[in-house]
Amino acid sequence: MAEEEPRIGVYVCHCGVNIAGVVDVKEVAEFAKTLKNVVVARDYKYVCSDPGQEIIQRDIEKYDLNRVVVAACSPRLHEPTFRRCVEEAGLNPYCFEMANIREHCSWVHMDDPARATEKAKDLVRMAVAKARLLESLETIKVDVTDRALVIGGGVSGIQAALDLADMGFEVILVEKEPSIGGRMAQLDKTFPTNDCSICILAPKMVDVSKHPNIKMYTYAEVVEVDGYVGNFTVKIEKKPRYVDEDACTGCGACAEVCPIEVPNEFDEGLGMRKAIYKPFPQAVPSVFTIDEEHCIRCGLCEEVCDADAIDFDQEPEIVEEEVGAIICAIGYDTCDPTEREEYGYGVYDNVITSIELERLINASGPTGGKVVRPSDGKKPKRIAFIQCVGSRDPHRTNPYCSNVCCMYAMKLAQLIREKYPETQIDIYYMDVRAFGKGYEEYYERSQKQYGIRFIRGRPAEIVEDPETKNLIVRAEDTLLGDVVEREYDLVVLSVGMVPRDSADVIQEVLSISRSPDGFFMEAHPKLRPVDTAIDGIFLAGACQGPKDIPSSVAQGSAAAARAATALAAGEVAVEPIVSEVDEEICGGCGTCVELCPYGAIELVEKDGKLVAEVTAALCKGCGTCAAACPSGAMEQNHFKTEQLYKQIEGAFRDPA
């Protein structure tokens, strides 16, 4: 294609008035006709429309065009549209070039139409200069392993695994903790229906364990991922439980005789568990785990285990799995409230977090569902909730809203009022964000039916009465314009969501990006909300950002659907705009290997010397290697050095 005489068609889009309201599009089209190798140039109101595309296709046939340039909006928006358009007319889709005269001209130079028009001409001249050297490229096809990996066994990961398994794909589910279930397993009820949380979750957990297409690794972590979309090799480290999962019946005799008690993490340290334990009654798998750090190896559990399931000889084990797609659903942590020193968490016994209250009010919690003060075990008569602890605080903690705190505070307040109607409850808030289906009605019900008082103002300080252990909350009521000071028996901090501690490791293992707030970054917030920048790796649930249970479940299903798109096809198409190596001049220095952000390049030995080799399925065409190569051995398809030089020359003059 590059050797034949270029015959170029140029099409200038009005984009309604987005471009034509500033840029003189007719003048730009007339200018394009003067450029070498341009056979036809037109302007049209909406080139991306069906009639606009038909004009291009007719011209390709009529004028025997072998290159097409469209001057319009961002390539991110309509480049795929026009590539498909020219391909349908028999032209290679990579013999198309786009000049962005909307974002780069009309939108940024609205106050200077004349200069915007001249700049548009420059961009068209540059695009035509590059188009003369465009080459036909062929899409790369990659075979797909029709299995998926789901990292994280919370409700979002569970939903993703079940959806994929129900579609007929084999799923590998990896959970870091001894049981799947995640945060939802800790909750008592779910808003806005106040349904029993575990009653909803437990059947899905059982479905995962029983599904013939799901292989579950609990108490395990993904430690290494190699490969690319359709062909990932995953290494999983199984931590030793010191209990044979296949032999254990979950009877609990071992825990009954174990002499060691330690704070129970599942109950947020409010209750105790044994050194051999099951996280919660509905745990899946329903087997016990020995806490190596606290076990004293007394042997009592071995003596009473009729199933002979205790195995102190277990060691960490690495297993390897081949998958075609990966869904990351590792969930979230709650923020550390000690960062807000003025609230006294960790100093005052009766200042607790919302997740601690969840465990107190839960019938399977450390108090059997009784809400009591940690200081003396008495039932609190006056309770204050403080919102936005760790959220919407750009100077001290996190700038973002955690989405769920307003709603779960109302839920907990309602549950307390149902159990103890005489309890007085105040919620100190900045703004109530009741955005979901049925949430506004839930908010109104909290006030009118349950008598919960909402005080608009962020408390400045909490102090403790040393004799009664009661807490005095000082805040400004911004609606009344008064400073209020009220005494409470218990203060609950509504803590926000933060990224998991393990997010650093997962980011490195998967080579995915994180947004400034620390959560994993999606490829596009609107158009590709569950994709990552790495093909074949998807996001689900709160690891991508704070969200409630319905949104997490929906995103789990969305991620499963996106993964299934690749798995079901049997092969995936990889864009050929990738780097290639001229092995004759490659010196094997490894600069490209070190700089490639996608791990797409490695050094291999060929004919007795080291040369770089690009895995096309991993390459994203970013051009880092081509820019850094000291010998000029790296060239990126569609952005080759000569093409870019001609484009640069075109910025100043017609290089022809």
Curated annotation (Swiss-Prot):
SUPFAM superfamilies: 4Fe-4S ferredoxins, FAD/NAD(P)-binding domain. Its cofactor is [4Fe-4S] cluster; FAD. It holds the Pfam family Fer4_9. Binds 4 [4Fe-4S] clusters per subunit. [4Fe-4S] cluster 2 binds at C258, C295, C298, C301. It is an enzyme of class 1 (oxidoreductase). [4Fe-4S] cluster 4 binds at C596, C619, C622, C625. GO terms for molecular function: 4 iron, 4 sulfur cluster binding; metal ion binding; oxidoreductase activity. Residues 238-269, 286-315, 577-606, 610-639 form the 4Fe-4S ferredoxin-type domain. This is CoB--CoM heterodisulfide reductase iron-sulfur subunit A 2. It comes from Methanopyrus kandleri (strain AV19 / DSM 6324 / JCM 9639 / NBRC 100938).
